Amino acid sequence: LSFSTFGSGGRDETIELIRGAIERVRAEQPEMKIEGEMQLDEAVNREIGLKQWHSSQDSESEPEVTGRANVLICPDLNAGNILYKALEQFGGFVAAGPILQGFKAPVSDLSRGSSQSDVLLVLETMRKLVSVNQQEKE
């Protein structure tokens, strides 16, 4: 996620980091469907996403993920924390996190407001992530 969509934000340092991360994922996981950088509304609303896509691309093809995203990656911890708490509080979503990646094992920094069920959900999610990571190493 970004304040920019498909290059609309120019050469901002944060956008360049996001673009670099997207290219790295594409190189390391070519089967993964990933698109970006994009604003939240374009990521989850197909009509808005396609409108922006067609105004920024020379191609007649349509994106697969735009407007249909089921995973949202935030550019930093601040944005991620704000997003997940807003989704919980305003949208009625259940959050399993935050779960931080990039360490030897998943790490969670639970909110002081977490309930017992929140803690159990995060622990179960992290257990599954560790299991998947171990299977990938084998």
Task: Cite the ranges covered by each PLM segment.
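Glycine-rich phosphate/diphosphate-binding loop of Rossmann-like nucleotide-binding domains
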Residues: L1-D41
